[in-house]
Amino acid sequence: HLPRVRAPAVVPSLLVSRPVFLHPRTVARYPASLHNARPEDCLLVRLEALALPSVRAIGLACRPLHDPAILVTEYLRHSLQYRRLLMRVPLTADGYRDRLLDAMASLLVDLHRAGVYWGDCSLANTLFRRDGGTIQAYLVDAETSETHAALSDGQRAYDLEVLVENVAFGLADLASFQ
């Protein structure tokens, strides 16, 4: 007996994700080349083992000699994309934007301490969970990420430069809709 599958409405995002409800859990699937999907799957498994905030890899579906593969992750319950989070609460809300940025900064610090170079830190590659007045950021796209015994100052600086540029772009893009 196969589980009941229902396709929900697709949430607009730069990252093409297709959530699928498989009773009793929900998974997200991301098409990617096998060349990129295999290391991303391994990295997500490593992040889970290190108890770092990220989506949980379930597996990789591929057919020999065919691309794209499908990276399957557990859907992060009660999480929101930054667009949904900030569309509900304006950027000008008292301290809200600062808490969101603090959550991203904390995530990046945790990743760097564990020797993880993100490579594409952005609002679009992050999911957020609210819990009262706090916000927790989760890495959702690890396609460009790498793990090392320790990061060099240059790797940390470049990751931070990418974060600043991508977050500024994401916030400017969002402000144009408000």
PLM ranges: what are they?
Residues Y75, R130, A142:
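Residues immediately flanking
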Residues I135-Q178:
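C-lobe/activation-segment region of protein kinase-like
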Residues H1-L86, P90-D94, D98, D102-G119, ...:
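Conserved ATP-binding subdomain of kinase catalytic cores across diverse folds
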Residues R63-P64, R130, G154-Q155:
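A general structural signal for short secondary-structure junctions and capping/turn motifs
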